[in-house]
């Protein structure tokens, strides 16, 4: 009531902060207990005359449970995510984690670009849940207009930016709005409403994906610099489906920065599972691309596979060598 009397346009209930609050029974201590979050939100809604947003913690097994609790209590919207429990580093001389307070430390709240994938996942989960059905303010690592567009495509109705503003100042908001406007124009979209939520239903459970879909890595030798990072990644961390061959054997040119006779990577497409690791470690843009390979196989999900196995319609697929 005091916030409304002071002229606030709305209230955001902090049920997400993981440090300095939860130790006192507030912040994430509330957001981690849906029943408690529902009760406190209900108390606020009894008196609220302005919109109330419930800010949720990511430090929870299933964030939709807390989102549903906010919905049941009558909240006008939810926001997510707050920061993630973390320890940034340890001083290897004193053996005290940083930051240090009189020789001791505590966990902090991790934020910024690194938490964006976690935020997108939890945003989509809430946006897709029919029992939530609330406006969502998206938070977590938004730094560019592309980040903003991704949050909106996954259902965010508004966005909040903190870390990027701390780094670059409020001028970054102008860059984001300019970029979003240019993007919308390029796609023929009239407003953000045309973008909002377009990706929500594109995310499905793993069991609903096509097991017979096949992609392989292709190397553009005109761009390859011969660093062979893709070979190392595949050999030591993936499926050992990249060989080193001489340029003469492959009948390819030297490419930028390469020297004669130095081996270059060659993908054995029959063994490639399309994990994408090679393209991620490659330092050259679009040198390695993932290409869909038609294999003539009918679409089959994991559920289809299990049903056909149970009916004796097919044999078990052997594991990949």
Stretches with model-predicted labels:
Residues 26-28, 92-96, 173-177, 258-260, ...:
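Short low-complexity, flexible loop/linker segments enriched in glycine and/or proline
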Residues 229-254, 259-260, 277-296:
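Iron-sulfur cluster-binding cysteine motifs and their immediate structural context
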Residues 216-229, 267-277:
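Flanking scaffold residues of small Cys/His-coordinated metal-binding clusters
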Residues 110-133, 143-222, 239, 287-289, ...:
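Alpha/beta catalytic cores of nucleotide-metabolism and tRNA/nucleoside-modifying enzymes
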Residues 253-280, 284-285, 306-321:
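Short Fe-S-cluster ligation motifs
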Residues 1-137, 143-161, 205, 211-212, ...:
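Alpha/beta enzyme core
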Residues 18, 59, 85-86, 166, ...:
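Residue-level marker for beta-strand->alpha-helix junctions and adjacent short loops that shape enzyme
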